[in-house]
């Protein structure tokens, strides 16, 4: 007996596709193109788990579907291969990161090919390939050579930057320093998350509870000279560009919130030189100077500048707060406060931004000993340092209005600071009396109180009037602010792209302050060979240990020292979609005509965890390349789809009391210490795991199979090695086949939904494929033979209708990426035709073309056995005939007094009176009525006829 054997079939067809380059991208793009892209994976040592293929299968279906419809398809794959895990492995084992990375890439490639994805493997790339990161370095050079013209709202060559006359008069070095201050890529002292153990700077997202996400090592905030990218110059365009993108609304909102545009005002608070109330005279002089000179770009050291979205609440500012890293800290802190402030700042340096801004944290802070003057009313207010204010947002200082800001209110309560309400809430507000008494916070808009001449005006009116008045005095100006910060772009690690930057040094080896790019013809700058990759434990990159042969460069008669930081992992993933289009071009980033033919990406699929940073950074780089004329479209990704997470299998747990008796989940609570106890007895209960055989479904939940009164807990968790619920696709493919895995992941539910893995579900899909096999292949034979039921005959009317309904449904569902419902329709088709004594070949062949994007290996095999030599992947997509969808007649039941007595055939368009007449004319109905009288006829078009007789 010859059965469906995927372990024999699948490797054979994978080899066929490789040998024949079945999925090679066409050199000449046709009338319609489809660029389908997966977010490429980091090649970890663990390989793929079953969550990875979900998105890959979806894009593979789209790609195969598009090819069948005659579209030119680009569907590539590659690897985001730089990264800290490989370097950590190298430090532990001494094995070069390149060796482990290539081993992991080979394993990923094996697994991806094992799953039958129709990638163009001739275009595969890795960000660690020297020929690839040569162009990553080249793009950095473009960023370095670009400044942002705010008038034109675009990036321009640095050579076109207007140089002020006073700078020109200072000389060439000053001119170069002025250019450096405007470049999109620049050096700056930045507060960074420094991890001594890892020996590198970490992004905020890589720090969890003050420790590194990788390894759990302590992280400290320190100032460090870093490469930065001026992404903030593009904030407005990054925000505006979201409007035209076919992206999930939630993802757009995440990006919008990350950019965080707000409007308000910048306000300067004059710093008192003495104790509170001592600076009336100097303050008056300061105000006179400001009235004549206006609001300066740089506030200097006489003021604390704040940004506020609520200038209307200035009269309610009762204290100020500066971030622990504020540049004026040393000016503000009085000698008697220094030790306390220093200790506080040191403690704050070990906290991440997330920790510091956690709303549930108790507020902490220290008084600096200094005061500032509120420009609205001339009051002296104290200046505190507190870690809930971040140096990177706004100006790093705030005016604290505890009556109308929740964080400020909590701080004021903690340190017994005054609360002055200046906005009257609506009369029907539940807490109005407490708010007006300074006992509660009100953050919304209202009517001004305790605000001098502005009393009685609305929030909007006070904002406009007070900002205008202070602007006239040179103490404020309207401002737009963004939460988005410039991108910290350098890392103190080995396994990353070297910067193509040279620092000039004098004869003593000291830096002169002059920098230049490595010439294009000397790219790529490759990594040096190092004896070890261990970090120093101090902020000095591993590349600084390189031999002088690599480190020191002579160029045009001058000596230079290479930049020893490396780029972050984000760098290579910012532009890989472009290189896929022209991966072997050694003369240019991309051929202009090919870029024009293929861009933008038509469909981009990946996890929502990349919603903010990767997508934002890619869009930023792309816009710079667009401004500089290297690409022709302003956005890289037209349509974005986020696949949902596949969780581990559902886990069942129950509780048992000390006697071992099961306790229902509804009868358990947590006590004050967090222990789970029986609600009635107070006895502590223990969690026990249950097998699937020990539970049964009841309503929306599960209960014990042995006692239906005991409700059990059922939930699925994210797959992780620590939980032991990771499912390896290798074992699934071995036991069920790749087609079963692909089909199951698409059948689990909507692509975007989060859903739990269930191995019995894979078995169910495998059973469906077995039925498809038996529908075409005669299994009882000793040799593989097409079933005698498959014949060269035309479909009957019903078969034709089922076929064309299936073609239409699968086509429309493929277009909508509703793959689960397409599969359900193909299951209906199979159920119908397996009941047919004859199965027309045209129906079987059309069905296989529909199923092929989902289960390509099996369909190739069946297609071959139906007598075809050419791959099913090259066959045109079937089209449905609207006429075939229409039934010429339908069969409906005829009831007499509610009981079915006969069935009649009639037109689906028959009207109620025609249905009644046809029913009465049927002999079986006449016989059932006998001598009784029909007193009422009820006809439901297309459904049934009911005759009421007496």
Swiss-Prot record:
GO molecular-function term, one example from the UniProt record = ATP binding
Query: Which SUPFAM superfamilies does this UniProt record tie to the protein?
Result: Anticodon-binding domain of a subclass of class I aminoacyl-tRNA synthetases, Nucleotidylyl transferase, ValRS/IleRS/LeuRS editing domain
Q: Which InterPro entries match?
A: aa-tRNA-synth_I_CS, aa-tRNA-synth_Ia, Leu-tRNA-ligase, Leu_tRNA-synth_edit, M/V/L/I-tRNA-synth_anticd-bd, Rossmann-like_a/b/a_fold, tRNAsynth_Ia_anticodon-bd, Val/Leu/Ile-tRNA-synth_edit
What the entry lists under Gene3D superfamilies is as follows: HUPs, Isoleucyl-tRNA Synthetase, Domain 1, Valyl/Leucyl/Isoleucyl-tRNA synthetase, editing domain
Residue numbers binding ATP: 721
Q: Spell out the reaction equation it catalyses.
A: tRNA(Leu) + L-leucine + ATP = L-leucyl-tRNA(Leu) + AMP + diphosphate
Recorded E.C. number(s)? 6.1.1.4
'HIGH' region (motif): residue ranges: 41-52
Instruction: Give the first-level EC class, as a single word.
Output: ligase
Give the location of motif 'KMSKS' region in residue numbers.
718-722
Subcellular location(s): the record lists: Cytoplasm
Quote the cellular component terms of the Gene Ontology held in the record: cytosol
Keyword annotations for this protein, in alphabetical order, are:
Aminoacyl-tRNA synthetase, ATP-binding, Cytoplasm, Ligase, Nucleotide-binding, Protein biosynthesis
> What does the entry give for GO biological process?
leucyl-tRNA aminoacylation
Q: Which family does it belong to?
A: Belongs to the class-I aminoacyl-tRNA synthetase family.
Q: Which NCBIfam families match?
A: leuS_bact
The entry's protein name is Leucine--tRNA ligase
Question: Per the UniProt entry, what species is this protein from, by scientific name?
Answer: Rhodopirellula baltica (strain DSM 10527 / NCIMB 13988 / SH1)
């Amino acid at each position: 007996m010859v059965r469906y054997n995927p372990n024999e079939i699948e490797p054979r067809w994978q080899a066929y596709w490789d040998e024949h380059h079945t999925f090679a991208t066409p050199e000449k793009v046709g009338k319609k193109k489809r660029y389908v892209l997966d977010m490429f994976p980091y090649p970890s040592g663990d390989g793929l788990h079953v969550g990875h293929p979900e998105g890959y299968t979806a894009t593979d279906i789209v790609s195969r579907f598009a090819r069948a419809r005659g579209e030119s398809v680009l569907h590539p794959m590659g690897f985001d291969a730089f990264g800290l895990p490989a370097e950590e492995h190298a430090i532990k084992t001494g094995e070069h990161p390149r060796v482990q990375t290539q081993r992991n890439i080979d394993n990923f490639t094996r697994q991806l090919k094992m799953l039958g994805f129709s990638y163009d493997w001739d275009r595969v790339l890795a960000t660690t390939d020297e020929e690839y990161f040569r162009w990553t370095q080249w793009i950095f050079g473009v960023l370095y050579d670009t400044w942002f013209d705010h008038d034109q709202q675009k990036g321009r060559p640095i050579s076109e930057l207007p140089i002020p006359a006073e700078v020109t008069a200072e000389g060439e070095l000053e001119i170069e320093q002025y250019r450096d201050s405007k470049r999109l890529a620049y050096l700056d002292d930045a507060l960074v998350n420094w991890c001594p153990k890892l020996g590198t700077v970490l992004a905020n997202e890589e720090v969890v509870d003050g420790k590194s996400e990788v390894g759990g090592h302590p992280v400290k905030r320190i100032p460090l000279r870093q490469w930065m990218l001026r992404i903030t110059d593009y904030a407005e365009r990054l925000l505006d560009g979201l409007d035209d993108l076919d992206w999930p609304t939630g993802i757009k909102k995440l990006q919008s919130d990350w950019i965080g545009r707000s409007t308000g005002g910048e306000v300067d608070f004059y710093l008192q030189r003495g104790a509170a109330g001592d600076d009336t005279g100097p303050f008056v002089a300061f105000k006179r100077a400001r009235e004549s000179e206006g609001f300066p770009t740089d506030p200097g050291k006489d003021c604390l500048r704040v940004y506020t979205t609520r200038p209307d609440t200035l009269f309610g500012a009762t204290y100020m707060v500066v971030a622990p890293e504020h540049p004026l800290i040393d000016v503000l802190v009085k000698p008697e406060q220094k030790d306390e402030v220093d200790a506080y700042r040191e403690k704050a340096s070990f906290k991440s931004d997330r920790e510091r801004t956690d709303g549930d944290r108790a507020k902490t802070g220290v008084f600096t000993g200094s005061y500032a003057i509120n420009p609205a009313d001339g009051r002296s207010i104290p200046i505190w340092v507190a870690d809930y204010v971040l140096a990177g947002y706004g100006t790093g200082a705030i005016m604290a209005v505890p009556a109308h800001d929740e964080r400020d209110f909590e701080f004021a309560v903690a340190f017994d600071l005054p609360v002055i309400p200046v906005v009257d809430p609506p009369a029907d507000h539940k807490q109005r009396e407490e708010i007006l008494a300074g006992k509660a916070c009100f953050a919304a808009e209202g009517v001004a109180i305790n605000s001098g001449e502005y009393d009685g005006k609305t929030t909007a009116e006070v904002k406009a009037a007070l900002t205008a008045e202070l602007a006239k005095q040179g103490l404020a100006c309207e401002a737009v602010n963004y939460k988005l910060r410039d991108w910290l772009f350098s890392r103190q690690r080995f396994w990353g792209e070297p910067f193509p930057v040279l620092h000039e040094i004098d004869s003593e080896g000291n830096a002169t302050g002059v920098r230049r790019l490595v010439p294009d013809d000397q790219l790529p700058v490759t990594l040096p060979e190092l004896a070890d990759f261990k970090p120093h434990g101090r902020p000095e990159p591993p590349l600084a240990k390189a031999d002088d042969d690599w480190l020191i460069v002579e160029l045009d008669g001058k000596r230079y020292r290479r930049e020893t930081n490396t780029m972050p992992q984000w760098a290579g993933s910012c532009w890989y979609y472009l290189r896929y289009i022209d991966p072997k071009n050694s003369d240019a980033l991309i051929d202009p005509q090919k870029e024009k033919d293929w861009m933008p990406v038509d469909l981009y699929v990946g996890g929502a965890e990349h919603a903010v940073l990767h997508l934002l950074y890619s869009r930023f780089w792309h816009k710079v390349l667009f401004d500089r004329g290297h690409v022709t479209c302003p956005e890289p990704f037209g349509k974005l789809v986020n696949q949902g997470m596949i969780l581990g299998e559902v886990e069942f747990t129950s509780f048992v009391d000390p006697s071992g008796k099961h306790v229902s989940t509804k009868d358990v609570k947590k006590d004050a210490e967090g222990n789970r106890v029986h609600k009635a007895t107070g006895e502590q209960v223990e969690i026990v795991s249950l097998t699937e055989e020990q539970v049964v479904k009841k309503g929306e939940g599960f209960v014990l199979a042995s006692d239906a009164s005991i409700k059990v807990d059922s939930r699925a968790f994210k797959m992780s090695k620590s939980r032991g619920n990771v499912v390896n696709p290798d074992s699934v493919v071995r036991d069920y086949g790749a087609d079963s895995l692909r089909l199951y992941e698409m059948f689990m539910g909507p692509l975007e939904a989060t859903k739990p893995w269930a191995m019995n579900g894979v078995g169910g899909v495998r059973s469906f494929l077995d039925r498809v096999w038996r529908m075409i292949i005669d299994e009882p034979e000793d040799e593989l033979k097409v079933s005698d039921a498959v014949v060269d005959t035309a479909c009957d009317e019903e078969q034709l209708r089922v076929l064309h309904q299936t073609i239409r449904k699968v086509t429309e569902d493929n277009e909508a990426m509703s793959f689960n419902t397409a599969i359900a329709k193909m299951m209906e088709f199979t159920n119908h035709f397996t009941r047919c004594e004859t199965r027309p070949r045209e129906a079987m062949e059309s069905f296989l073309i529909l199923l092929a994007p989902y289960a390509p290996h099996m369909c190739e095999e069946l297609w071959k056995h139906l007598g075809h030599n050419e791959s099913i992947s090259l066959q045109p997509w079937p089209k449905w005939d609207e006429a075939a969808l229409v039934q010429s007649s339908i069969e409906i039941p005829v009831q007499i007094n509610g009981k079915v007595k006969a069935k009649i055939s009639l037109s689906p368009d028959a009207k109620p009176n025609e249905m009644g007449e046809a029913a009465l004319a049927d002999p079986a109905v006449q016989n059932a009525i006998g001598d009784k009288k029909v007193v009422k006829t009820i006809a439901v078009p297309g459904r049934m006829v009911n005759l009421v007789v007496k």
